[in-house]
Amino acid sequence: MSSARFESKILSRAELVAAVAAGRLPRPLVFTNGVFDILHRGHVTYLDQAAQLGATLVVAVNTDESVRRLGKGSDRPLNQVQDRAALLAALGCVDAVTSFHEDTPQELIGELRPDLIVKGGDYDMDTLPETALVKSWGGRAVAIPFDFERSTTALLGKIRQG
């Protein structure tokens, strides 16, 4: 059986950096990142809005090891990085998915040099080191307010309470 078509959007970090450097991904390039452990309506709305800000949306997913370092709980992530990447790649608004093992995506952002970085409305963009980085080459940092207040952590809390 052949792979699902969306799996071609999942790229190694090196493949993604090479594709961007070769101009194979149209600009403006929009970058966002996250854990995306249990994909919910808040995630997909946010990603669709981010995609509308440019020609290409790149999503970087935390590896399982980096999720554990974030302190979200000993049982997190619930879904392995390959599965989280596949679900994101299946979304029509997402053009490319990769993963990163560091605590922050700063190094990857430096390699890709996106035109915009996008985070959810709960981030203060002025305090993020990624903001200064993207601005250093003329890029922008944008916070997208949440239309749907959803949280994987809160959802898991409800499930655990029964």
Swiss-Prot record:
Pathway: Nucleotide-sugar biosynthesis; ADP-L-glycero-beta-D-manno-heptose biosynthesis; ADP-L-glycero-beta-D-manno-heptose from D-glycero-beta-D-manno-heptose 7-phosphate: step 3/4; Bacterial outer membrane biogenesis; LPS core biosynthesis. Its EC number is 2.7.7.70. The keyword Nucleotidyltransferase applies. Keywords: ATP-binding, Carbohydrate metabolism, Lipopolysaccharide biosynthesis, Nucleotide-binding, Nucleotidyltransferase, Transferase. One of its GO terms (biological process) is lipopolysaccharide core region biosynthetic process. One of its GO terms (molecular function) is phosphotransferase activity, alcohol group as acceptor. The keyword Transmembrane helix does not apply. It is an enzyme of class 2 (transferase). Catalyzes the ADP transfer from ATP to D-glycero-beta-D-manno-heptose 1-phosphate, yielding ADP-D-glycero-beta-D-manno-heptose. Cannot use GTP, UTP, or CTP as substrate. Is not active against the alpha-anomer substrate. Is also able to catalyze the ADP transfer to beta-glucose 1-phosphate in vitro, yielding ADP-beta-glucose. Belongs to the cytidylyltransferase family. NCBIfam families: cyt_tran_rel, rfaE_dom_II. PANTHER family: BIFUNCTIONAL PROTEIN HLDE, FAD SYNTHASE. This is D-beta-D-heptose 1-phosphate adenylyltransferase. The lineage of its organism: Bacteria, Pseudomonadati, Pseudomonadota, Betaproteobacteria, Burkholderiales.
